[in-house]
């Protein structure tokens, strides 16, 4: 907990916000210490040995933003949950909005964690529900392709150059 607090206080602005598909902390004068830190501590209590691997990163200097592509392995402390429901690796993209201060350093003003819908489905309803979502998305993709082909056949839609 002390390390988490130290890292957040070193690299995040006091008014930093946090946005995750399951929860968020809006920007306020003390949102880092009275919100973001609590989210991180809650996740630390819920999950042990969380491993995050960064696969790629990009700094957009013009927009003061960092993009991270990562995988996160989560294992619950609760044995029943760990055995039957929750021990998985999830892919995500993390967006960090930065602000450069007078000291010349960049600080995180906003963290946004982005997961695909099937990753979130597996989090909420584990046990293969992510496969159902993937199949539904593939089915909808095929319906769209058929619809476009039908309208192109009728001459309603044409491909633009």
Where are these regions (language model features)?
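Eukaryotic short linear interaction motifs
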Residues: 17-19, 26-27, 75-79, 103-105, ...
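A solvent-exposed, acidic/Ser-Thr-rich amphipathic alpha-helical stretch
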Residues: 13-74
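Short acidic-aromatic low-complexity motifs
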Residues: 1-15
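Eukaryotic intrinsically disordered and solvent-exposed regulatory patches
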Residues: 3-5, 53-55, 78-84
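Generic preference for well-ordered alpha-helical elements
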Residues: 5, 33-36, 89, 108, ...
């Amino acid at each position: 907990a002390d390390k988490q607090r130290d890292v957040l206080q070193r690299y995040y602005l006091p008014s930093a916000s946090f946005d995750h598909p399951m929860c968020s902390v809006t920007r306020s004068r003390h949102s880092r210490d009275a919100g973001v830190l609590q989210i991180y501590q809650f996740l630390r209590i819920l999950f042990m040995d969380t491993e995050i691997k960064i696969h790629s990163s990009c700094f957009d200097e013009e927009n003061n933003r960092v993009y991270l592509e990562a995988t996160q392995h989560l294992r619950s402390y609760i044995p029943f949950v760990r055995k039957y429901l929750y021990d998985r690796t999830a892919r995500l993209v993390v967006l960090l909005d930065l602000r450069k201060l007078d000291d010349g350093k960049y600080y995180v003003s906003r963290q946004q964690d982005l997961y695909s819908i099937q990753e979130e489905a597996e989090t909420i309803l584990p046990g293969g529900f992510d496969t159902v979502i993937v199949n539904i998305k593939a089915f909808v993709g095929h319906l769209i392709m058929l619809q476009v082909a039908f309208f192109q056949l009728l001459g309603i839609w044409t491909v633009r150059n």
